[in-house]
Swiss-Prot record:
Main location: plastid
NCBIfam families reported for this sequence: ATP_synt_delta (TIGR01145)
Gene Ontology molecular-function annotations: proton-transporting ATP synthase activity, rotational mechanism
Record's subunit section: F-type ATPases have 2 components, F(1) - the catalytic core - and F(0) - the membrane proton channel. F(1) has five subunits: alpha(3), beta(3), gamma(1), delta(1), epsilon(1). CF(0) has four main subunits: a(1), b(1), b'(1) and c(10-14). The alpha and beta chains form an alternating ring which encloses part of the gamma chain. F(1) is attached to F(0) by a central stalk formed by the gamma and epsilon chains, while a peripheral stalk is formed by the delta, b and b' chains.
UniProt entry keywords in alphabetical sequence: ATP synthesis, CF(1), Chloroplast, Hydrogen ion transport, Ion transport, Membrane, Plastid, Thylakoid, Transport
Localization per Swiss-Prot or TrEMBL: Plastid, Chloroplast thylakoid membrane
InterPro entries: ATP_synth_OSCP/delta_N_sf, ATPase_OSCP/dsu
Nucleotide-binding in keyword set: no
Any one GO CC term of the record: proton-transporting ATP synthase complex
Stated role: F(1)F(0) ATP synthase produces ATP from ADP in the presence of a proton or sodium gradient. F-type ATPases consist of two structural domains, F(1) containing the extramembraneous catalytic core and F(0) containing the membrane proton channel, linked together by a central stalk and a peripheral stalk. During catalysis, ATP synthesis in the catalytic domain of F(1) is coupled via a rotary mechanism of the central stalk subunits to proton translocation.
Name of the protein: ATP synthase subunit delta, chloroplastic
Membership in a protein family: Belongs to the ATPase delta chain family.
Organism, scientific name: Phaeodactylum tricornutum (strain CCAP 1055/1)
Coiled coil regions in record: none
Length: 187
């Protein structure tokens, strides 16, 4: 996920404050579940995100739509936090706040989030094997896979962690072969 560094700098204190609050009040699991569901909901309902990001829409209207849309699904504290973001004019940072908050939770729980791009959908057994290997490689208690299917990779898969990129794609192998042939044929 490529996010503007300024956005991260502004969103981080909100995520950190909510994280600290959730630990203090012993509601981290509820807020984490809310944010995991909210992350999916916002991706599927781009109209809501656009509405909340619109500077012309009043703060009261934004609070009202959040309450009507999400009150039944969210913990009271999560909803209050969203209202604070609206009141402070920071609701447009919601997706970044969610991402940072979840990273803090996963880091605390020794859960690593790993992006995997694949040419074809993994089977259940392939996912299980991949998770086991990644747990060993990353020294993590749990692995959270974020899988995207990209037919342009031709075959294989690409693994992205915070510090590493491991490329097992056929596309990459073909590019390496082409470079090698270019250097060999130039001689």
């Amino acid at each position: 996920m490529s996010v503007n560094p300024l956005t991260l700098k502004i969103a981080s204190p909100y995520a950190r404050a909510l994280f600290d609050f959730s630990v203090e009040k012993n509601i981290m699991h509820q807020i984490t579940a809310d944010f995991q569901n909210l992350e999916i909901f916002l991706k599927e309902n781009t109209e809501l995100t656009e509405y909340l990001d619109n500077p012309v829409v009043s703060k009261n209207a934004k609070c009202e739509i959040l309450a009507k849309t999400l009150q039944a699904q969210l913990n009271d504290e999560t909803l209050k936090f969203l209202m604070i973001l609206v009141e402070r004019g920071r609701i447009s940072l919601l997706t970044s706040v969610i991402t940072i908050y979840l990273e803090l939770v996963y880091e605390t729980a020794s859960i690593k989030t790993i992006e995997v791009s694949t040419a074809f959908e993994f089977t259940t057994s392939q996912k299980t094997i991949l998770v086991q290997k990644l747990k060993e490689l990353m020294n993590a208690r749990e692995i959270r896979l974020m899988i995207t299917v990209d037919p342009n990779l031709i075959g294989g898969f690409l693994i992205k962690t915070q510090s590493k990129v491991i490329d097992f794609t056929i596309k990459n192998q073909l590019q390496k072969l082409a470079k090698h042939l270019d250097t060999v044929l130039e001689i």
